[in-house]
Amino acid sequence: MKTFVLAIDFTDSAAQVADYALALANQFHARLVIVHAYEPRADSPTDSVHTLARLEQIKEQLTHRSKGSVEVSVVARHGEPRASIKAVVAEEQADLLIMALADDRPYTARFMGSLPTDMIPQTVVPMLILPPCSSYKPMKTVVLAIDLSEPTDAVILGKVKEFVQVLGVSLDIICMDDNPDSQRLEAAKRIQELFDGLPHTFSFLPGYDLTITLDDYSVTHPADLIMMLPKHHNRLAIWFMESVTQQVARQSLLPVLAIV
């Protein structure tokens, strides 16, 4: 993974989000591209100048903190935020998109959602969603929530493995299933074989709501990150339904990494 794109706003939590992205980029030896997408106002023609100045200030601060070990660049892009962020991800050939639920009212972001959760079904690269006011700390344990009702893409599991190896974490794989049949037990066995040589566990857990199941699991199994494998949905479903990954990202107190 060579390039991370951080889509940032200028709320109070922006500095913490930038520090988190910087630490992660440093761990992966990746360059960090910071983008601020905004819709210019007719009554404020100097928006672009002020935006670029603030981004340059953030760039200088991060470059100083990393002592130059992370290449940091900035992009100010005016236009509809979703389209602008997706365009920068494509132009920079990003390997990871990072966004935060950075609403000035964190509980509003958690219960109502925001731009980051809206973008989960649209992302074409892995996407890390940070809860408000996230602070980076070295990770020890990652939870991978997996659905075995459909075949799991080996390429996507390969990306999961890469993240686990670089982060140097143990992996807790969970599947919400009260009574797994032989087919799902066999699928679980194949997945465990893929992670052979890496510290990991696999558990089938009862439940009907993954968010609740993850909360219950975290009581006895503390983790630093949740990984999800979003399913592909048609456009109609994207418009009218919230996916499981979106729901977990919106309500989780932990960062959520959607692997696509």
Q: Language model features by range: what are they?
A:
Residues 62-69, 194-197:
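Short helix-capping segments at alpha-helix termini
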Residues 71-74, 202:
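Rossmann-fold cofactor-recognition segment
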Residues 76-84, 210-211:
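Charged docking surfaces used in two-component/phosphorelay signaling
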